[in-house]
A protein has these predicted regions:
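Short, glycine-/aromatic-enriched active-site segment of Class I SAM-dependent methyltransferases
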Residues: 163-181
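A short SAM/SAH-binding and catalytic strip from SAM-dependent methyltransferases
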Residues: 128-140
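A short, conserved alpha-helix within the catalytic core of class I
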Residues: 138-148
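Class I SAM-dependent methyltransferase SAM/SAH-binding core
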Residues: 63, 71-114
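Short alpha-helix
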Residues: 182-198
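Conserved beta-strand signature within the Rossmann-like core of class I S-adenosyl-L-methionine
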Residues: 153-161
Length: 219
């Protein structure tokens, strides 16, 4: 296997967990909120896309790979999902996630796992799996995609940063060269091949801001 950079990624997200979650809470100054709305608009757009694509989740078993601070997890629980498992490599993110679902009164429907999905043995199958804001930081996606395919029975939603957008060099410099977190970008053919090779069939492929957002099904 190729050398993996996940420990480096985990340290980065652990360090910025609280600040990143403020994108969702809006607990920032007015200028910072305005900058988020402009430069990070697709963070909000991808959230809306996931909720639209998953539709009625009542009674569903869901896995959120790279769940971060639990924003998708708690919303699925509030919408009636039977159980949601969030998997993430950053302990501080998982603390935020556990606090969030507790505050929202849905903790009984949720559990969180500190792990890289590459080394995690899923205890069950899931009707729906999502990996949003995840592939940006993955050096070698194929094996993780195959693992996700192994525990997904119905729908897999994923978001991939697009190659050749104006934000690509900005993120590359800011994240990789200044903050020390590797970041990757993908073309549409690359994403389609990765998903197909892992055992998925693409149901829909959309451009959402600077992202490829893909709804796929296991085959």
């Amino acid at each position: 296997m190729k050398q993996d950079n996940m420990p480096q990624v985990a340290r980065f997200w652990n360090d910025i967990a609280g600040d990143f979650d403020k994108i969702y809470t809006g607990k920032k100054g007015g200028i910072a909120r305005a900058l988020d709305q402009y430069f990070r608009k697709d963070i909000y757009q991808r959230y809306d896309w996931v909720m639209e694509k998953t539709g009625d989740v009542k009674g569903k078993q869901i896995c959120d790979v790279g769940c971060g601070s639990g924003r998708f997890v708690t919303e699925f629980a509030k919408r009636g999902a039977a159980h949601i498992t969030g998997v993430d490599v950053a302990p501080e993110m998982l603390k935020l996630a556990q606090n969030l679902v507790t505050q929202d009164g849905v903790a009984k429907s949720c559990d969180f796992v500190l792990a890289d999905v590459l080394n995690w043995k899923a205890p069950q199958k899931y009707d729906i799996s999502i990996a949003i804001g995840f592939w940006d930081y993955i050096m070698d996606p194929p094996e993780r995609l195959r693992i996700i395919r192994s525990f997904t029975t119905g729908q897999f939603l994923s978001a991939w940063p697009r190659f050749w957008t104006w934000r690509m060099p900005v993120r590359k410099v800011r994240l990789q060269y200044i903050q020390g977190c590797p970041v990757y970008f993908f073309t549409k053919p690359q994403v389609e091949k990765l998903l197909t090779d892992a055992g998925f069939k693409v149901a829909s492929f959309q451009t959402v801001g600077k992202l490829h957002c893909v709804d796929a099904r296991p085959v």
